[in-house]
A protein has these predicted regions:
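Alpha-helix capping/helix-boundary segments
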Residues: 10, 41, 81, 99, ...
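Active-site neighborhoods of divalent-metal-dependent phosphate/nucleic-acid chemistry enzymes
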Residues: 57, 68-114
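Residues at the C-termini of beta-strands that transition into short coil/loop
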Residues: 39, 77, 115, 127
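Phosphate- and divalent-cation-binding pockets in alpha/beta enzyme and binding domains
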Residues: 44, 84, 120-121
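Short acidic, glycine/proline-enriched helix-loop-strand junctions
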Residues: 62-75, 119-127
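Short, well-structured N-terminal submotif of metal-dependent ribonuclease cores
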Residues: 1-37, 51-64, 106, 116, ...
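A structural micro-motif
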Residues: 33-34, 71, 109-110, 123-124
Length: 127
């Protein structure tokens, strides 16, 4: 089974049960993959909750995704991820840099994301 990473937006939609926001291709990949999130997704979820962009806490999202889909937080060493992220010059968004870098560092794993900038700059993006 393939390992795939979830971007923050996809994690939120899945936790909210809003599958209508996902494409058939994304849903198929979710069904057929072992799912991971970068720890940076947890941090971004916390930030989004703090600024009232989402109502669920980071912990609530991650617990729900783990219980329903078996999603785990990636435990890869952080230094090699950052070594990749410093070269992701296509974005100023530190969350996107690290999330993409986690997928790259794990054998160029697919990253399920609707983010247009990520889709343009990471060849293994699934949407």
């Amino acid at each position: 089974m393939t390992t795939a990473y979830l971007d923050t937006n996809v994690a939120v939609w899945l936790a909210q049960g809003d599958l209508t926001r996902l494409t058939p291709t994304a849903l198929d990949s979710i069904r057929k993959s072992n799912l991971l999130v970068s720890p940076m997704v947890a941090l971004e979820l916390t930030y989004l909750h703090e600024i009232n962009r989402i109502t669920l806490t980071s912990q609530d999202v991650l617990l729900k995704l783990r219980a329903e889909l078996g999603v785990e937080v990636c435990d890869s060493a952080f230094a090699p991820i950052i070594a990749i992220a410093v070269n992701e010059k296509w974005t100023r968004d530190p969350f996107d840099r690290v999330i993409v870098s986690h997928a790259k560092a794990n054998g160029l794993s697919p990253l399920i994301s609707s983010d247009e900038a990520i889709r343009k700059n990471y060849v293994k993006t699934v949407w």
